[in-house]
Amino acid sequence: MDTMRQRILVVDDDPSLAEMLTIVLRGEGFDTAVIGDGSQALTAVRELRPDLVLLDLMLPGMNGIDVCRVLRADSGVPIVMLTAKTDTVDVVLGLESGADDYVMKPFKPKELVARVRARLRRNEDEPAEMLSIGDVEIDVPAHKVTRQGEQISLTPLEFDLLVALARKPRQVFTRDVLLEQVWGYRHPADTRLVNVHVQRLRAKVEKDPENPQVVLTVRGVGYKAGPP
């Protein structure tokens, strides 16, 4: 196996859909593994160490939301949910549990691959860059965030969101702009992705999430970085 190939873990109990996903992803150069049971997914993530997890919400053993919550307790692996159009409440629950993005069924293979690639993109040769918002320090190439020497553990997506705000401290970002810059969307998308991840980011970087100083809301517009 080419060790440079990125591995996708597909967690879905629909054999035909899992087979289709495997064919599409392997055709795009990814390695894939398939698990059909939610409770087995946790073991598979530990053993296979995938670069990304495609996670169906409706699973036997343990549902996708619970799988997501447990994974997020100790892993920053990117998670993209697969969900039916009727699952709007579950979409929010999934995002609040730690999913980075979601794809509605039925989806076009190109759309799915675009979402996967957006979450896997990483610039391997980033120049040295240090940013700060208040007393929060961001070492961009090291993907490290600290406050007074104490490291703050963020998922890759939360890190990307914080960096986007910190790089342009005077700019107010609309949710649509953040969806394009951080999630890689090229068309209007679900702004709940932004709202939920701002909440998750604040829970980690703010001293008092109810009175944010690092990620500020500009009412009626969007979000911006707090004062330096």
Swiss-Prot record:
Where in the cell does this protein reside? Cytoplasm
Q: Which domain of life does this protein belong to?
A: Bacteria
Recorded hits in InterPro entries, A to Z, give: CheY-like_superfamily, MtrA_REC, MtrAB_MtrA, OmpR/PhoB-type_DNA-bd, Sig_transdc_resp-reg_receiver, WalR-like, WH-like_DNA-bd_sf
The residues that make up the annotated DNA-binding region are: 128-227
> Does the record's keyword annotation contain Cytoplasm?
yes
Task: Identify residues that carry 4-aspartylphosphate.
Answer: D56
- Outline the extent of the Response regulatory domain: 7-120
| Role according to the record | Member of the two-component regulatory system MtrA/MtrB, responding to environmental signals. Controls expression of a number of genes including dnaA, ripA, fbpB and probably itself. Probably plays a role in cell division.
Q: Show the PANTHER family listed in the entry.
A: DNA-BINDING DUAL MASTER TRANSCRIPTIONAL REGULATOR RPAA, REGULATOR OF RPOS
Question: What name is this protein filed under?
Answer: DNA-binding response regulator MtrA
